[in-house]
């Protein structure tokens, strides 16, 4: 609601935007662009093709100011648009002769056929041209006509029209889709859904809508949620009107019936302010109803997309996983590959950020969290000054939902354009001063609007919070001490490319450990006072309770103090007793705050450098308590934030405008097919250790390396958290997002050494030693993780490179895992002492005796091989469904110090195959 109010109160310039005014009023910038001699950076490294000549001819006839005549090859006679002045380039002088030193024969010169003069007229005079329709194969029936046109639209073999259609049609920046073919809208729902998918003009908004539809659990859940929101809003308005305008509170002490205190015809005697408020609410309510009706069409399209294209029925929307949705989107993309090669300049510019080829799990997360990634990075790099300019709050960062909305409006809405992309003008160093001044003005406007609306927003939040939680606090007084993470903690803990539902799940799993840590920490003085209060209040309540047993009717009306009966004091004392008991620790609880904090860090992935080695200290407990606060305290801070946010926007944040502009310029990169994204959100899957360097940058003496790195190991934690969600199978805890039995398998043929084999005894001793080592190291070998017997076909295991949710260029290298990703799920489920993987040392790697890193070369150490059940006689890895396992790309370690007879046979087979090649 607050964001909608912001967008409606912002002065909108329908004529031109701030960036257009900036380009026109800056005389020193873009001189090359105005002179026509700037470098085309977009096509600087692009290869030249023959079909570019056709595009150049079309541009010359439609848009260009310069075109050659039909008979003039050497000169350049210009043809102008009507009403425009000729603007000939300096290097295309009229009558310039060919270079006499040119050794290329004229017969080898490639020239495009010149268009007639009547085709070089302006589009307004020439008018649109309609090509002759192609004949329909077979009988010309209505059904065949509709199918033929749908096929021509989806699988176009040659250009039937003079101008491109679909999402590439129109001028740059428009991307208007082609209108549906005749008869398609009345045809098959699958064809309709496919047509809408092919003609998506803004891929970012579409993917966000798909994700929002998934979060809301389908069509009917969204409809019910929207209707109930309207019902709740109407109830609050009617209920408050009744309580404030229709009840005579002066008659309440002396009345016994509702009719005695109700004011007759109260709606006709309401105050002017309340009448205006009700009319404004009525307008808002009607707009929401019309918005819901209009939104039904979009929701129906999303339902068709899930049902017909992704093959996910409406009944499964509440139980399907997001990984399954991503996999089906990739399958839909792969089933309709792009075959067009002769793209125009407008098409290339459009596909630079809207390409459907960039739709794997990594790209989808980047599209959904394009804005949030910049927000996470700004808070991690301490770019924003969020301190309160008051004497007692200068050292505290103030982050609330109100501040988040203000930052989203002031910064993100200014940086991003209507297409969801970073405006290129914001990335130019020459615009730094103007952009900084504009940010200051936006901060001032946002602070002023929040200050004006603060009384109404505060009153609304207080009423809603009171009506929501009063019954809960009354029935369970201990809920007053329930804690949760505040807004600052959520943005500090959130990782790059981590979607909302994944982040919420991670935070929810950390709540039991956080509560245990807070309750465990020494509070002896508080407990002593709580025990005394509990004893006194409990004793009084017990005596009063026993007295009510003998004569309940007379004793409950007995007044202990004037106008205060026994029932009143019993309720008050019972509440105090419950609050006191809630502050007393359990007698069976084990005191170990360091172990409890390690369990929290396993889920939050947040451990500042000054926490290391001091997890038991009171300072760490106080810092964590600032992030994990009681719910009533968070609510009071949100109410107070409405008054403090204008101070932050008017005083503190304007000091950070230069740093904000520099941050976006230095930490924004362009990815082909994806557009502008945050630097830290692009993971280097091929070199997993490159992401780990982000975590160790604090130890590096190079200030430049530290400047371009994240703090507290955020980059490494985000990278491995992403692998856990999209590479590690959540059902098995192993790499790969398919069950092992449903994937391609490679099994070595079983070989049985004879009983007289001289190596049989040694091999059996070796197997016994490996099992003993596994038991001594505390490794639990059970189920599919146990070591396969020597004389049986081994059980195949997944490959860390096998993820169907990542494209080949995003497939992680074996060294990116080490042994960490294989076992991190189990470590997070059951934390153990000394087993915490910090953000900086987030990779657990096996080191050989020579000191070399096995994980760097994609190998496993001895303990890892023993734990995973892999050896030379076993199939240790399994490839993705689109690739077959070969001996070169398998993850098995071909070198081992001790090998048995099966290992020797396997090495002999490998050597024999290499010789045959």
Curated annotation (Swiss-Prot):
Residues 248-275, 561-564 are lumenal. Coiled coil: none annotated. It is found in: Preautophagosomal structure membrane; Cytoplasmic vesicle membrane; Vacuole membrane; Golgi apparatus membrane. Its main location: membrane. One of its GO terms (biological process) is piecemeal microautophagy of the nucleus. Residues 443-463, 634-654 dip into the membrane without crossing it. The keyword Methyltransferase does not apply. It is a multi-pass membrane protein. The chain crosses the membrane at residues 227-247, 276-296, 540-560, 565-585. Acetylated by HAT1 at Lys-621, which increases the ability to bind vesicles during nutrient starvation induction. Changing residue 621 to R: Disturbs the acetylation levels of ATG9 and impairs the binding ability to vesicles during nutrient starvation induction. InterPro entries: Autophagy-rel_prot_9. Keywords: Acetylation, Autophagy, Cytoplasmic vesicle, Endoplasmic reticulum, Germination, Glycoprotein, Golgi apparatus, Lipid transport, Membrane, Phosphoprotein, Stress response, Transmembrane, Transmembrane helix, Transport, Vacuole, Virulence. The keyword Acetylation applies. Residues 1-226, 297-442, 464-539, 586-633, 655-917 are cytoplasmic. Residues 16-37, 119-177, 854-895 are annotated as: Disordered. Pfam families: ATG9. It comes from the Eukaryota. GO terms for cellular component: autophagosome; cytoplasmic vesicle membrane; endoplasmic reticulum membrane; Golgi membrane; phagophore assembly site membrane; vacuolar membrane. Belongs to the ATG9 family. Forms a homotrimer with a solvated central pore, which is connected laterally to the cytosol through the cavity within each protomer. Acts as a lipid scramblase that uses its central pore to function: the central pore opens laterally to accommodate lipid headgroups, thereby enabling lipid flipping and redistribution of lipids added to the outer leaflet of ATG9-containing vesicles, thereby enabling growth into autophagosomes. Phospholipid scramblase involved in autophagy and cytoplasm to vacuole transport (Cvt) vesicle formation. Cycles between the preautophagosomal structure/phagophore assembly site (PAS) and the cytoplasmic vesicle pool and supplies membrane for the growing autophagosome. Lipid scramblase activity plays a key role in preautophagosomal structure/phagophore assembly by distributing the phospholipids that arrive through ATG2 from the cytoplasmic to the luminal leaflet of the bilayer, thereby driving autophagosomal membrane expansion. Required for mitophagy. Homotrimer; forms a homotrimer with a central pore that forms a path between the two membrane leaflets. Interacts with HAT1. This is Autophagy-related protein 9. It comes from Pyricularia oryzae (strain 70-15 / ATCC MYA-4617 / FGSC 8958). The lineage of its organism: Eukaryota, Fungi, Dikarya, Ascomycota, Pezizomycotina.
């Amino acid at each position: 609601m607050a964001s909608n109010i912001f967008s409606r109160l912002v002065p909108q310039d329908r004529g031109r935007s701030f960036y257009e005014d900036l380009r026109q009023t800056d005389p020193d910038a873009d001189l090359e662009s105005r002179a026509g001699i700037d470098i085309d950076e977009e096509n600087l490294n692009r290869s030249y093709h023959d079909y570019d000549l056709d595009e150049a001819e079309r541009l010359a006839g439609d848009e260009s100011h310069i075109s050659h005549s039909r008979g003039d090859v050497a000169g350049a006679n210009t043809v102008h648009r009507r009403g425009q002045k000729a603007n000939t380039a300096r290097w295309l002088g009229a009558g310039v002769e060919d270079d006499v030193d040119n050794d290329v024969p004229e017969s080898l010169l490639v020239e495009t056929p010149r268009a007639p003069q009547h085709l070089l007229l302006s589009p307004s005079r020439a008018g649109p041209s309609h090509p002759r329709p192609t004949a329909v194969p077979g009988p010309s029936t209505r059904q065949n006509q509709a199918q033929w046109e749908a096929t021509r639209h989806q699988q176009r073999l040659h250009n039937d029209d003079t101008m491109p259609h679909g999402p590439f049609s129109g001028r740059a920046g428009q991307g208007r889709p082609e209108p549906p073919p005749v008869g398609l809208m009345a045809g098959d729902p699958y064809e309709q859904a496919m047509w809408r998918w092919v003609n998506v003009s803004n891929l970012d908004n579409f993917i966000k809508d798909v994700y929002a539809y998934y979060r809301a659990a389908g069509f009917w859940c969204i409809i019910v949620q929207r209707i109930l929101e309207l019902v709740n809003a109407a109830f609050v308005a009617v209920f408050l009107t009744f309580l404030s305008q229709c009840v005579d509170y002066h008659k309440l002490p002396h009345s016994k019936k509702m009719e005695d205190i109700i004011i007759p015809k109260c709606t006709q005697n309401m105050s002017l302010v309340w009448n205006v408020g009700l009319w404004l609410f009525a307008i808002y309510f009607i707009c929401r109803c019309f918005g819901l009706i209009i939104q039904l069409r979009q929701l129906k399209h999303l339902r068709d997309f899930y049902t017909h294209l992704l093959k996910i029925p409406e009944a499964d929307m509440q139980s399907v996983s997001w990984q399954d949705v991503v996999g089906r989107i990739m399958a839909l993309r792969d089933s309709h590959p792009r075959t067009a090669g002769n793209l125009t300049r407008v098409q290339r510019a459009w596909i630079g950020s809207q390409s459907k080829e960039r739709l794997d799990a990594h790209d989808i997360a980047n599209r959904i969290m394009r804005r949030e990634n910049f927000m996470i990075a700004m808070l991690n790099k301490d770019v924003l000054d969020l301190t309160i300019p008051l004497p007692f709050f200068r050292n505290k960062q103030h982050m609330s939902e109100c501040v988040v909305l203000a930052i989203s409006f002031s910064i993100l809405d200014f940086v991003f354009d209507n297409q969801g992309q970073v405006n290129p003008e914001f990335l130019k160093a020459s615009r730094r001063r103007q952009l900084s001044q504009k940010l200051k003005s936006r901060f001032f406007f946002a602070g002023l609007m929040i200050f004006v609306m603060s009384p109404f927003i505060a009153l609304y939040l207080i009423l809603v919070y009171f009506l929501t939680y009063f019954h809960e606090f009354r029935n369970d007084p201990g809920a007053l001490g329930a804690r949760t993470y505040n807004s600052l903690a959520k943005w500090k803990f959130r990782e790059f490319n981590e979607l909302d539902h994944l982040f919420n799940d991670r935070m929810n799993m950390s709540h039991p450990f956080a509560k245990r840590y807070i309750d465990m920490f020494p509070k002896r003085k508080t407990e002593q006072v709580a025990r005394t209060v509990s004893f006194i209040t409990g004793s009084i309540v017990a005596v009063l309770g026993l007295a009510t047993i003998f004569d309940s009717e007379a004793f409950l009306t007995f007044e202990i103090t004037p106008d205060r009966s026994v029932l009143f004091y019993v309720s008050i004392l019972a509440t105090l007793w419950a609050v006191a008991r809630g502050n007393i620790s359990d007698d069976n609880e084990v005191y170990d705050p360091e172990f409890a904090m390690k369990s929290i860090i396993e889920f939050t992935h947040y451990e500042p450098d000054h926490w290391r080695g001091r997890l038991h200290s009171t300072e760490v407990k106080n810092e964590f308590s600032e992030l994990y606060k009681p719910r009533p305290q968070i609510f009071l801070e949100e109410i107070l934030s409405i008054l403090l946010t204008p101070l932050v926007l008017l005083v503190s944040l304007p000091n950070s405008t230069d740093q904000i502009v520099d941050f976006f310029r230095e930490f924004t990169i362009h990815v082909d097919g994806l557009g502008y994204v945050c630097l830290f959100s692009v993971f280097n899957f091929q070199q997993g250790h490159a992401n780990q360097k982000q975590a160790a940058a604090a130890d590096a003496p190079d200030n430049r390396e530290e400047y371009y790195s994240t703090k507290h190991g955020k980059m490494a934690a985000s990278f491995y958290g992403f692998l856990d969600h999209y590479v590690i199978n959540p059902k098995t805890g192993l790499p790969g997002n398919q069950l092992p039995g449903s994937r391609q398998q490679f099994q070595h043929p079983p070989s049985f050494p004879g009983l007289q084999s001289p190596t049989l005894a040694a091999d059996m001793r070796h197997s016994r030693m490996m099992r003993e080592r596994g038991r001594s190291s505390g490794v639990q070998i059970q189920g599919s993780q146990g070591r396969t017997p020597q004389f049986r076909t081994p059980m195949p295991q997944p490959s860390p490179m096998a993820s169907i949710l990542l494209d080949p260029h995003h497939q992680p290298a074996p060294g990116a895992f080490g042994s960490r990703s294989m076992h991190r799920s189990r470590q997070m489920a059951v934390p153990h002492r000394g087993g915490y993987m910090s953000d900086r040392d987030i990779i657990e790697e096996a080191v050989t005796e020579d000191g070399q890193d096995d994980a760097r070369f994609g190998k496993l150490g001895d303990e890892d091989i023993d734990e995973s059940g892999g050896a030379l006689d076993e199939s240790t890895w399994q490839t993705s469904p689109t690739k077959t396992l070969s001996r070169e790309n398998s993850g098995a370690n071909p070198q081992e110090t001790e090998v048995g007879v099966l290992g020797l046979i396997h090495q002999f087979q490998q050597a024999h195959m290499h010789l045959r090649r």
